[in-house]
Amino acid sequence: MDLSEHIAINRQLAESACQRLTEEINKLGFAVAEIKHYPNYDDASFILIKDPYTGQHNLTCYWYDEFKKQRIGSLQFNSDGTFYAEYDVVKTHPGKLTWFVEGVTAWGKADSIKAEAKLLPMPG
């Protein structure tokens, strides 16, 4: 299977994962103008990575900043139908100023997608 086939086959799950990451970012309560980029499947760069366990090639997606220099997120599909995604936020929590939001993560499979924010305590 070539790259374009992997992109097409994984589209529905990828769009659900992107939506879940976006919901998790929005739950944090940032003002609309504070978040400049959200994960969008069509904005990703795509590559196939060989799974060392199964030998199959799995789709991996990367998101980059507006200058295409710094990676700000990734979405990895696994041979068993699961995925893991993370997307950078890198901002002080809007409602809890003693916490820093590193990013959000999502994982699971089509019928069960979980997500959470990655929070770090601010240096005191």
Protein language model features and the residues they cover:
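Ampiphathic alpha-helical segments that act as solvent-exposed interaction surfaces
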Residues: 10-11, 17-25, 78-124
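Amphipathic, interaction-prone secondary-structure segments
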Residues: 25-84
